[in-house]
UniProtKB/Swiss-Prot annotation:
NCBIfam families according to UniProt: fabZ, PRK00006.1
Main subcellular location: cytoplasm
Name by which UniProt lists this protein: 3-hydroxyacyl-[acyl-carrier-protein] dehydratase FabZ
Gene3D superfamilies from the UniProt entry: Hotdog Thioesterase
Residues in coiled coil: none
EC code: 4.2.1.59
Keywords linked to the UniProt accession: Cytoplasm, Lipid A biosynthesis, Lipid biosynthesis, Lipid metabolism, Lyase
Record organism: Streptococcus suis (strain 98HAH33)
Catalytic function, reaction form: a (3R)-hydroxyacyl-[ACP] = a (2E)-enoyl-[ACP] + H2O
Root EC class: lyase
PANTHER family: 3-HYDROXYACYL-[ACYL-CARRIER-PROTEIN] DEHYDRATASE (PTHR30272:SF1)
GO process terms (BP): fatty acid biosynthetic process; lipid A biosynthetic process
Amino acid sequence: MIDILKIKEALPHLYPMLLVDRVLEVSEDEIVALKNVTINEPFFNGHFPDYPVMPGVLIMEALAQTAGVLELSKEENKGKLVFYAGMDKVKFKKQVVPGDQLIMTAKFVKRRGTIAVVEAKAEVEGKLAASGTLTFAIGK
């Protein structure tokens, strides 16, 4: 398990953009992390005031950060950054609301030089909330 302090060492994100609370499982090419979604998230002020729903784009950002923790924790990538290069086949299946625990899985399926492709999914209570293929570049 990787706690929030180690996550903050790996990722350059700060509040309110740090969207990974804990890593539950990690292997060479796969990572499982969680985000506790609370009513105190700043985006709920405007999305939507009377019906708070986590924006889908932030779910995808949380998935990208999950993959980033795995990649940036590697010795050869310390001090580098991960940049979005693309998203494909993104689907949103379930609304994510305050009180949900978002379980995020990212699996690296292809690497070529500084480019990586990840299959990612986010679930709430075992039900798929979002999924997609993320492409990113590692750089500084």
